[in-house]
């Protein structure tokens, strides 16, 4: 029976006693201990004799466990062989505590090192995210006036070009595909915004007056000598300056994208076909007609048109940069000769003296958003003034659209009158003071107090000077994966500019028409002294590339907007911003809704074809003289909300497209 008990205990406990298991699992040998020869295992019967009956109480068992010599932690293993167990003078648990303390110190060092390393890696990754170059091709959008130019901008982004690279290529493309609106012989303005750094730069490459141009010459002969209308082109200098600041791909490669469009040919757009059929310049030369009407009649939309002459010019500029355009080379000589032959006074020195300006945009806060727009001689301050005035009205979804339209019409009358007082601040110091007043919320509240809720003003609140601007303009909007926003508007002034075409294929602008002089218009409106003609001066401009971002932080709505139509464009931008930022409409709906524009010279409120008869009747009941027209302006846009980016064209345009990378 005793043998059976012993066998059952051994099968239950195995080869080791509970004390042996404790010594193996709880107290490993310290690394510095010398290994000792393994001691032979005692017989189970001898241990049981010492421990006594296994059914004894736990306290007795634990006491006996403390008397067990722990072979795995002893340095005198050899002396224990064959010896009976004896009480130890040293508590093995005290030794274990010391050993654990030693191991905890080592663990602390390891954990500290790991945390330090992890923190360093995290900081490096955060810095890379915010300040490093993008590592993958993410979302983006491009919007232009022609589908092939939008596709070209997208292609540049796909080849890891910057947002500005894409904008430059697309703008040059529009100079080929939309020669009635833009080109190398014109000028414009580009607004670039860095989202991560919250920094903005405006590159002004508006045309300037030749040094020998005088107001008297324009008064006598502006309508018979088209050479007098040509300003020094700024397009090449401006795009090159933008690329120097923000470009990623080589300049020559960016220009090669556009040169391929000119060389391979493009499909004539609806807008170009209409311009060639209805808006040919009266002085169109044989060279002009051979270039744009090669078959002797206006081309149909979709017809293939090639411009190998412009492809060659772009190749030259890609190799030599703007020097080939401005520093007395063959291109410069051709432009000067063409202008002088048509009665103009431009010289080679005018080209060498020209420079693009890099400056800060004007800005205002509207409904928690920062609105950025070009400073004078552009009319960005008047746009912000309109928003400041409207901000004080209770414009919500609860207010009827008809009432909101009345407030907008009266507000735009004030804003456009303010715009007519602007000009080039380099030549008139009072313009800076006028700009400050336009940006003031206090002044806006004062103007708002003069607006009746129920009746249109019978006469303008402010003196109105001559307002005439480029009716045609080309737009490029880019939001790229590099977290940059680019908005650009360029122009030749009226369709095909001056109509003067150089042997190299450069179509020259007519921007001197944007200056003000006596008896300039049929209605004999008063000329603006601030916008009078002076050598080297830049005329008043309604080219208004506009960027919107959250006033605080990074999260929220970002917008890039552009418009054509001169003063009508300012009215259109105001209403689109109102729809998006105040009425919380999506961008597509905001661009599609009907728009109005007050013509200050005739005191007529123009509305587009989207207006209903009920809306027109409401406005007429308030005292507005309403005239319905098909289209007032095109406003294109791109919107970014968090990480979602979309590009949207104005639905009134048959040719413009917006493309997005999803």
UniProtKB/Swiss-Prot annotation:
Q: Does the keyword Ribosomal protein apply?
A: no
Q: Could you tell me which residues belong to the region Disordered?
A: 26-90
- Principal subcellular localisation of the protein: membrane
Task: Give the Enzyme Commission number.
Answer: 3.4.19.13, 2.3.2.2
UniProt feature coiled coil, ranges: none
Functional pathway: Sulfur metabolism; glutathione metabolism
Which residues lie in Low complexity bias regions? Answer: 72-83
Similarity field? Belongs to the gamma-glutamyltransferase family.
Protein name as it appears in the record: Glutathione hydrolase 7
> What is the protein's species of origin?
Rattus norvegicus
Name of the gene: Ggt7
């Amino acid at each position: 029976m005793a043998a059976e008990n012993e066998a059952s205990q051994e099968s239950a406990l195995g080869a080791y006693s509970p004390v042996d298991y404790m010594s193996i699992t709880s107290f490993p040998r310290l690394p510095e201990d010398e290994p000792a020869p393994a001691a032979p295992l005692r017989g189970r019967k001898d241990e049981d004799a010492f421990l006594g009956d296994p059914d004894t109480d736990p306290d007795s068992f634990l006491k006996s466990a403390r008397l067990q010599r722990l072979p795995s932690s002893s340095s005198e293993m050899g002396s224990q062989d064959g010896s009976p167990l004896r009480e130890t003078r040293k508590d093995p648990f005290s030794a274990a505590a010391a050993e654990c303390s030693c191991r905890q110190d080592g663990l602390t060092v390891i954990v500290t090192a790991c945390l330090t390393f992890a923190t360093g890696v995290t900081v490096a990754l955060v810095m890379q995210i915010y300040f490093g170059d993008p590592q993958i091709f993410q979302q983006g959008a491009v919007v232009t006036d022609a589908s092939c130019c939008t596709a070209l901008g997208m292609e540049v982004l796909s080849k890891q070009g910057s947002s500005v690279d894409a904008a430059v290529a697309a703008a040059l493309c529009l100079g080929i595909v939309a020669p009635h609106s833009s080109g190398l012989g014109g000028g414009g303005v580009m607004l670039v915004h860095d989202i991560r750094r919250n920094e903005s730069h405006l590159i002004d490459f508006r045309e300037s007056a030749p040094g020998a141009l005088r107001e008297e010459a324009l008064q006598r002969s502006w309508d018979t000598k088209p050479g007098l209308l040509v300003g020094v082109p700024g397009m090449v200098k401006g795009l090159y300056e933008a690329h120097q600041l923000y470009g990623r791909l080589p300049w020559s490669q960016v220009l090669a994208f556009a040169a391929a469009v000119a060389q391979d040919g493009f499909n004539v757009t609806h807008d170009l076909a209409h311009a060639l059929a209805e808006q040919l310049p009266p002085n169109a030369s044989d060279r002009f007609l051979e270039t744009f009407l090669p078959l002797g009649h206006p081309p149909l939309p979709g017809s293939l048109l090639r411009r190998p002459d412009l492809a060659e010019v772009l190749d030259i500029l890609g190799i030599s940069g703007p020097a080939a355009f401005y520093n007395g080379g063959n291109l410069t000589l051709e432009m000067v000769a063409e202008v002088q032959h048509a009665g103009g006074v431009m010289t080679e020195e005018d080209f060498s003296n020209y420079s693009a300006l890099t400056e800060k945009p004007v800005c205002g806060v509207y409904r928690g958003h920062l609105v950025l727009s070009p400073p004078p001689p552009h009319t960005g301050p008047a746009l912000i003034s309109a928003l400041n005035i409207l901000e004080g009205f209770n414009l919500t979804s609860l207010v009827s659209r008809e009432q909101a339209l009345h407030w907008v019409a009266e507000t735009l009358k004030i804003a456009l009158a303010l715009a007519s007082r602007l000009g080039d601040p380099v030549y008139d110091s009072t313009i800076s003071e006028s700009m400050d007043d336009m940006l003031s919320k206090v002044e806006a509240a004062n103007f708002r107090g003069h607006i009746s809720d129920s009746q249109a003003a019978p006469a303008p609140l402010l003196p109105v000077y001559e307002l005439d601007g480029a009716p045609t303009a080309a737009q490029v909007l880019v939001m790229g994966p590099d977290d940059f926003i680019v908005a650009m508007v360029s122009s030749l002034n009226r369709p095909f500019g001056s109509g003067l075409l150089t042997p190299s294929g450069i179509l020259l602008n007519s921007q001197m028409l944007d200056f003000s002089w006596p008896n300039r218009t049929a209605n004999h409106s008063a000329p603006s002294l601030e916008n009078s003609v002076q050598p080297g001066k830049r005329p008043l401009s309604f080219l208004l590339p506009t960027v919107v971002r959250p006033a605080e932080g990074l999260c929220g709505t970002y917008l890039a907007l552009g418009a054509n139509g001169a003063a009508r464009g300012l009215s259109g931008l105001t209403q689109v911003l109102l729809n998006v930022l105040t009425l919380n409409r999506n961008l597509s709906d905001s661009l599609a809704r009907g728009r109005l524009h007050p013509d200050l010279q005739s005191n007529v409120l123009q509305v587009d074809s989207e207006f209903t008869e009920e809306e027109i009747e409401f406005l007429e009941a308030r005292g507005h003289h309403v005239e319905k027209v098909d289209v007032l302006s095109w406003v294109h846009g791109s919107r970014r909300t968090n990480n979602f980016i979309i590009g949207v064209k104005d639905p009134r345009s048959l040719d413009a497209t917006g493309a997005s990378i999803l």
